[in-house]
Amino acid sequence: MLELTKRITHVDASEIHDNLVLPYELRIRGRLRATTETNLDVGLFLDRGPVLRDGDLLEAKSGEIIRIRAAEEPVVTARVETGLPLARLCYHLGNRHVSLQIGSGGAIGEDDRMGWVRFPPDHVLEELAERLGATVVHHTATFDPEPGAYNQAGQGHSHGHSHGHSHNHDHEHSHGHKHAH
């Protein structure tokens, strides 16, 4: 088994040994066993960090370079006018903490005034998108959602404020008595 242990950024295309095609649900994992396009058995042994994106490169302990490819998988694409309608759709879907891929236009001949939001099939989200004026289509496509504002390599999840870290302290609440923690 080829052990993939390192994320790398740039190599010459001729240095790429093979492709590893994975659906989104597997690209969020740092540890897994899989098979490449040429049936090479590989194991991912990556530190926690960003989701593997289509085109990302991994290096094996033995030096081989493997390119990540997003697999085609069942998705829903909701098409709506760009501008406020697209912003409204993104806001309401994002408010449900679902992974979203966002784009505009599309295939040759499609209206550039249309935007789209792609997400995993979910009847509640689909109904919401339709109520917000989107046309919903079930199909198979690659799913490469937005990484999110807090998803940066080597950093944990944060909400822009701190709660501190303490296990043993006393504090007083406005109701006049203390609690030991």
UniProtKB/Swiss-Prot annotation:
Coiled-coil portions? none
Q: What is one term from the GO cellular component aspect held by the record?
A: cytoplasm
Q: Does the keyword Cytoplasm apply?
A: yes
Q: Domain of life here?
A: Bacteria
> Which SMART domains does UniProt cross-reference here?
UreE_N
Start and end residues of each stretch annotated as Disordered: 143-181
Its subcellular locations are: Cytoplasm
Q: GO: which molecular function terms?
A: nickel cation binding; unfolded protein binding
Cite a single Pfam family from the UniProt record. UreE_N
Report the main location listed first in the record.
cytoplasm
Query: Keywords in UniProt for this one?
Result: Chaperone, Cytoplasm, Nickel, Nickel insertion
Which is a GO BP term held by this UniProt record?
Answer: protein-containing complex assembly
The entry's function note states: Involved in urease metallocenter assembly. Binds nickel. Probably functions as a nickel donor during metallocenter assembly.
The family note in this entry says: Belongs to the UreE family.
By what name is this protein known? Urease accessory protein UreE
Q: Which organism is it from?
A: Marinobacter nauticus (strain ATCC 700491 / DSM 11845 / VT8)
Record gene name: ureE
